[in-house]
Amino acid sequence: LPPLLAEFNVAALLLRLADADERTLTSRIKALAGPVQAAGTALLVASHHNLVARAGADGAHVDGLQEMEEASSLRPQRILGVGQLHTRHDAMLAGENGADYLLFGEPDSHGERPSPDAIFERLQWWAELFEPPCVGYAATLEEAALFAGSGADFIMVADFVWSDARGPKAALADAQAAIAERFKQAFGAPQAART
């Protein structure tokens, strides 16, 4: 992982942990925090916001407004991002209540997610009107390129990077090149692709 982070322009790594006791979870986060942060990448922990400070992570990613409220003590010292915002109204409330970023397009607890066109529309709407950064969850390389044309501030690349037969290095290279190219086509200027 550290060589990948050193080579690519990765803004943040979202860590989703399997269920375990708090001590084990804290140890897992601590083991990754140093190498990830040394590469200039923020380490964000999904769902376990209560472990973020103790384990040395940079912040938490939570699902929905209720979890955002429960994790509000992280702000302003730590990053607090929120996803699973199913309506425009929920997204606006998250932005008004201090979310550091909003994630659109990630699967829900049943593995369902909006269509790529619906995600693009939500990203474009948010990017044009609001200040907090928006992140597009890309399940495929094609979605990563599509969402870059929406004006999204960041693109979160999903498991396709890890499942690529060529390895994550080749998949990340392709993703960042596709993101940069699509951004240039859409906005007429190059952008350093950040995933």
Region spans (language model):
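N-terminal active-site wall of soluble small-molecule enzyme domains
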Residues: N9-P76, F120
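Surface-exposed amphipathic alpha-helices with a cationic face
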Residues: L5, T26-Q37, E69-P76, M92-G95, ...
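A short, well-ordered alpha-helical element
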Residues: L1-E7
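Short secondary-structure boundary segments
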Residues: L17, G64, Q84-H86, E106-P107, ...
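Catalytic cores of alpha/beta
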Residues: L43-D58, H86-D100, L129-V157, D174, ...
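Alpha-helix N-cap and loop-to-helix initiation/capping positions
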Residues: A20, T24-S27, Q66, H86, ...
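Glycine-rich phosphate-binding active-site loops on the catalytic face of alpha/beta enzymes
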Residues: G64-S73, Y101-R113, A148-A178
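Extended, intrinsically disordered, low-complexity segments
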Residues: A180-T195
